[in-house]
Amino acid sequence: MMSKQEFLGALYNGLSGLPKEDIENSVQFYSEMIDDRMDEGMTENEALEDIGSVNEIIQQILSESSLPKLVKRTVSTSDFVTHTYTVEDDFTNIIIEDAESNINFYKSNDDKCRVLCDEREKVTHTVVNENNTLTVRVKDERNWFERINIGFFIADMRVSVYLPKNKYDSLNAASMSGDIDVANEFTFDNAKVGSISGDVSVKADVKQELNISSTSGDVYAENLNLEKFNAESTSGDVIINNISATECINASSVSGEIDLSNVKGKEIFANTISGGVMLADTVASQKLKANSTSGEIDLKRCDAKNIVLDTVSGEISGTLLSNKQFITETTSGTVNVPQCISNEECRITTVSGDIYIKIADQ
């Protein structure tokens, strides 16, 4: 049975002949369908079974994908204007939802909140402060065919949020095709930041839980001390630097690379299907698990009480900080690991890849 990530990856690859935006919208749609079923109490496997065969879904989407011929046009900065919305009252929660704008957060220099939105014909925004929550949403009144930008040059539109305080309770920011950048001047208790085709970068301090995601863009986070952290991308890279979590750290991608550097946590999981996994100075107090189907796994000065490394055709190599009881399995690869006696276990499995592990400073 496929996992959710494998299902979305197969869907993404199966629709490769369609426009990029159509692919990403389809992937996002089915991702939300799976999540909705799991919210209703289904397991991941039950949700996937209820949705149906990914191959049948691909064929259905392809059969319905005929589009009218479009007239080529150019959208430049002269086609939109920047409107400034001033927010008078205080708030502690922030919700930003847009379709194609880049979203950026800045510290206000005059203790006032302002939201600057690039807008054009039929594309405006609503900015509301209610129930202690600042909500910014795009209002797109275009017809569906006006939103398809095949072969066009599209200038970047922006939503710039200037915040007067450094500390807020929650942040929820989402864009369809824009990049999202959360600067390091701010602190949130919880944050959820995601884009379908844009890159996502979070440098702000998050105290409890941070979730960042992108379907085809890269996701990046650094300099965090928090409880839980989750980062995922379908075809983009996941890059995590200088992060410490008291609970779980999870990084996943279907075809992108996973790069963790100076990462500490109780449990750390790095999972990709066709990309590589690179872990440097990554230490879990309990469990460290990394797996890739066809990519390599490379470790530099990593450690945990329990380590699980798994590939099908990729090589597994690197250095650990302390002795382990090594349990290795490979069908056709070469195995070279230290002969150690330890109560801590490192289990390494590959089908056709080689295994080369050393203990640092030995």
Regions found by a protein language model. Name each.
Residues M1-Q362:
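Intrinsically disordered, low-complexity terminal regions
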